[in-house]
Amino acid sequence: MKILHISDTHGKHHQLKDLPEADVVVHTGDITEEGTEEEVKDFIEWFCSLPYKHKIFIAGNHDDCLYGANIEDLPDDVHYLCNDGITIDGIKFYGVPMFLHDDLDGNLPELFGRIPDDTDVLLTHQPPLGILDEQDGINYGDYTLKRVMDVRPKCHLFGHLHHTVKTQEVFRRVRFSNAAGGKYGRYELLKI
């Protein structure tokens, strides 16, 4: 399965041109810049129009207007994951968004603890601590995402940090992908 991974488009998704062929396109958050409903509607319209068989997205820290939202009337091939998952062609995707409310309320360890052990592709907005998370010599990843090493998915896809954009295979054959350069027209293509 080919996965096109994009993230952190911050309302500039229309700048992504000539995207490669893939079976699934995944957006790991920060679809908006200001977090407005208008930005979300524009993104969803664009995302639904993409020529991929399956489309999955989660929310990032800029997408707070989606906190507690129930997105209805999405086409059958478009999936918004909010602490839940979907199986596509036998591959189990699970998505955990990044909402400031959950972070401030201390809910992230519980939410990460719910990641199913049989997850194949984990989607979060933020990286785990120490993996593709360094900016200016400081690691900004989330310590509570250590659950990734218990689950050991085939891939962990995220964004959030714009200066470490690459795919890298690390530790116990888990492939980590940071595609946070979406607003600059960058993406990652993975095969699992």
Locations of regions flagged by a protein language model:
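Active-site neighborhood of phospho(di)ester-bond hydrolases with catalytic His/Asp-centered motifs
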Residues: 5-7, 25-30, 56-61, 81-82, ...
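Short, conserved loop/helix-junction motifs that constitute active-site signature segments
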Residues: 18-20, 47-52, 73-75, 115-117, ...
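Active-site-proximal segments of metal-dependent phosphoesterases and phosphodiesterases across multiple
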Residues: 32, 37, 118-152
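Core catalytic region of metal-dependent phosphoesterases/phosphodiesterases
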Residues: 6-88
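Binuclear metal-dependent phosphoesterase catalytic core
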Residues: 85-89, 146, 150-151, 155, ...
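Short amphipathic alpha-helix with an adjacent loop that forms part of the alpha/beta core around
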Residues: 15-21, 87-89, 108-116, 190-192
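Acidic, histidine-bearing metal-coordination/catalytic regions of metal-dependent phosphoesterases
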Residues: 1-14, 183, 192
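Binuclear metal-dependent hydrolase catalytic cores centered on His/Asp/Glu-rich metal-binding motifs
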Residues: 91-121, 138-147
